[in-house]
Swiss-Prot record:
Lipid addition sites, S-diacylglycerol cysteine: C23
Coiled coil residues, start to end: 115-155
Keyword Cell inner membrane attributed: yes
Chief place of localization: membrane
Protein name: Toluene efflux pump periplasmic linker protein TtgA
Organism of origin: Pseudomonas putida (strain DOT-T1E)
Keywords: Antibiotic resistance, Cell inner membrane, Cell membrane, Coiled coil, Lipoprotein, Membrane, Palmitate, Signal, Transport
Lineage of origin: Bacteria, Pseudomonadati, Pseudomonadota, Gammaproteobacteria, Pseudomonadales
Gene name of the record: ttgA
Lipidation (N-palmitoyl cysteine): C23
């Protein structure tokens, strides 16, 4: 019975130690702090939709120079690659044969005309029959037609430019024999001012644009609804602005695209037929576009765009987005974000949906662009 006080003391000591240990653990566990995130407040802004489409230049008018009579070329009267005017003489074909033919036609006309006039007097005197007079008059008419034909052939020995423009390389030299109806053109003239640019656009993009315009989601771009800018192969911007001319009704079955034709002034002949270019088309204006910084848009396992926003209770929400294209460093959002939403762009790795957070203005993105800045950046937008 003497060991009971010792056991009691030992138990008391252990209990006291356990109690003190629990108190220390409670004191060592601080309260969890809300993570800090940087947000951007979404604001709607006017945005001109643009599409950059590949295309090629083509001459406004093209004419092949061909001979209309047979003969030997005596002279070439132009410089290859020069500008020629409509009606300017380009070649001289040997006219000797046609001059002789013309002289013969004139003589024949004099003879048949004289005979017809004599028969007309004689028929009144009944010295010749009506049939003889009719035959003589018909020969006179044939002689007049032969004379006109000879004059035309002689005129065709001077080969003239059918249109104004830049003439290319001559396929024939002095001394070469050319003939009416030959397959090879003597030269080709191309009118380069103005000049066409043929670009392609998918039918899906055209249909979407038309639906948006009909529903009122997009407004026509005012007087610039059909304006087109041109980017050259070296990346520079062509200084002249063009206008949209028409859209082909037929769809290319192999590519599923339609061809748009734009017309550009080309006074300096900077653009030449066959050049590869990109046309920037101003398709319409979205007066309340939602632009989200790319830092705040991520992809889920399926590749769909998502975003995290902070609600009124300062808790994180997950949003599924529908993004159509990029504009500089922003995404154009069609669904999933609304004006006033606070989009998280900083601290995404520290939060998840449902977590309460502390909010501050993001420092890793630029402030939303004003109207002038937005218009300056529109040229960088490309359809995905």
């Amino acid at each position: 019975m003497q060991f009971k006080p010792a056991v009691t003391a030992l138990v008391s000591a252990v209990a006291l130690a356990t109690l003190l240990s629990g108190c220390k653990k409670e004191e060592a566990a601080p309260a969890a702090q809300a993570p800090q995130v940087g947000v951007v407040t979404i604001q709607p802004q006017a945005f001109t939709l643009t599409s950059e489409l590949p295309g090629r230049t083509s001459a406004y008018r093209v004419a092949e120079v061909r001979p209309q009579v047979n003969g030997i070329i005596l002279k070439r009267l132009f410089k290859e690659g020069s500008e020629v005017k409509e009606g300017q003489q380009l070649y001289q074909i040997d006219p000797a044969v046609y001059e002789a033919t013309l002289a013969n036609a004139k003589a024949n006309l004099l003879a048949t005309r004289s005979l017809a006039e004599r028969y007309k007097q004689l028929i009144d005197e009944q010295a010749v029959s009506k049939q003889e007079y009719d035959d003589a008059n018909a020969k006179r008419l044939q002689a007049e037609a032969s004379l006109k034909s000879a004059q035309i052939d002689l005129r065709y020995t001077k080969v003239l430019a059918p249109i104004s423009g830049r003439i290319g390389r001559s396929s024939f030299t002095e001394g070469a024999l050319v003939s009416n109806g030959q397959t090879d053109a003597m030269a080709t003239i191309q009118q380069l001012d103005p000049i066409y640019v043929d670009v392609t656009q998918s039918t899906a993009e055209l249909l979407k644009l038309r639906r948006d315009l009909e529903s009122g989601q997009l407004q026509k771009a005012g007087n610039n609804a059909a304006s087109v800018q041109l980017v050259l192969e070296d990346g520079s911007l062509f200084k002249q602005e063009g206008r949209l001319e028409f859209s082909e009704v037929a769809v290319d079955e192999t590519t599923g695209s339609v061809t748009l034709r734009a017309l550009f002034p080309n006074p300096d002949h900077t653009l030449l037929p066959g050049m590869f270019v990109h046309a920037r088309l101003k398709a319409g204006v979205n007066a309340n576009a939602i632009l989200a910084p790319q830092q705040g848009v991520t992809r889920d396992l399926k590749g769909a765009p998502t975003a995290l926003v902070v609600n009124q209770e300062n808790k994180v929400e997950l949003r599924q987005l529908k993004a159509s294209r990029t504009l500089g460093s922003d995404w154009l959002i069609e669904e999933g974000l609304n004006p006033g939403d606070r989009l998280i762009t900083e601290g995404l790795q520290y939060v998840r949906p449902g977590v309460e957070v502390k909010v501050s203005d993001a420092t890793n993105v630029k402030k939303p662009a004003g109207p002038d800045q937005a218009n300056a950046a529109k040229a960088d937008a490309k359809a995905e």
